[in-house]
Swiss-Prot record:
Localization of this protein: Cytoplasm, Cytoskeleton
Keyword Nucleotide-binding tagged: yes
One GO MF term attached to the UniProt entry: ATP binding
EC number: 3.6.4.-
Name this protein carries in UniProt: Actin-79
Family: Belongs to the actin family.
Pfam families found in the cross-reference section: Actin (PF00022)
Note: There are at least 13 actin genes in potato.
Keyword Protein transport in annotation: no
Source organism of this protein record: Solanum tuberosum (Potato)
UniProt catalytic activity: ATP + H2O = ADP + phosphate + H(+)
Amino acid sequence: AGFAGDDAPRAVFPSIVGRPRHTGVMVGMGQKDAYVGDEAQSKRGILTLKYPIEHGIVSNWDDMEKIWHHTFYNELRVAPEEHPVLLTEAPLNPKANREKMTQIMFETFNTPAMYVAIQAVLSLYASGRTTGIVLDSGDGVSHTVPIYEGYALPHAILRLDLAGRDLTDHLMKILTERGYSFTTTAEREIVRDVKEKLSYIALDYEQEIETAKTSSSVEKSYELPDGQVIPIGAERFRCPEVLFQPSMIGMEAAGIHETTYNSIMKCDVDIRKDLYGNIVLSGGTTMFPGIADRMSKEITALAPSSMKIKVVAPPERKYSVWIGGSILASLSTFQQ
């Protein structure tokens, strides 16, 4: 969250609401019945953490309202009734979701004006393009959205319910198989941190597995909050490999490379060349080192042999949806 015209968000925190697992015994400590974002994160040992957004769609409106309240009053420290608001949503979101969002903004927060933009379109804005296909992969959902001259092509948008949270779950499972126990909502956050700090995507998965067996070049170590150090080896690339092989976690879906290709194939034959040449990655789950090269390799294998393929992975892609929103909301034409 932040202000239009800024080049980076002022506040970045996880969409989590945490409630105490135990009853407070210390009188006068000012214990809250709910914690949001980083505060929930830091007290996670005594809380049950809930994510009000599932697969990019809000499933718990009371908690979502808490998060927005926290954003306005504690993070940005603004009065929402004094500022127009730009919110974003996943493509192909149910219409009722957007209506509920609008209702809360106007009725609970009294915002003077609001607009709901599609996330992937904003990422393309941020990359300075008007044509391209965006693969946007966050915590709960991934999408491929082809955009031509600024228009999203709804018939070719594909959605993949596979994203960061699934990778964290997969890593939890791999580590459990190795004898480490991560079960609570708080421990899941530790695993997420392992994933974000150490994972990478192999250019050739089979070959990387062989390398990991014979050499220790892949091994890194991670220190848990209690001081215990665990070695992380092949898990580093086994975890995000799921993006290219969803069957590893029992999903029948196509991987992100194939989904991108399928999305392009649903577009008019005349514009495919422009899409192949502008494949833009966005969202936190595209932050793995090696993802652009692997994506490029996989799509080259699927596309016609003469096709020029370019995968763009802007360094700020974790926040490119926000940056695109900042650009859009500061245009004078938009404000009218």
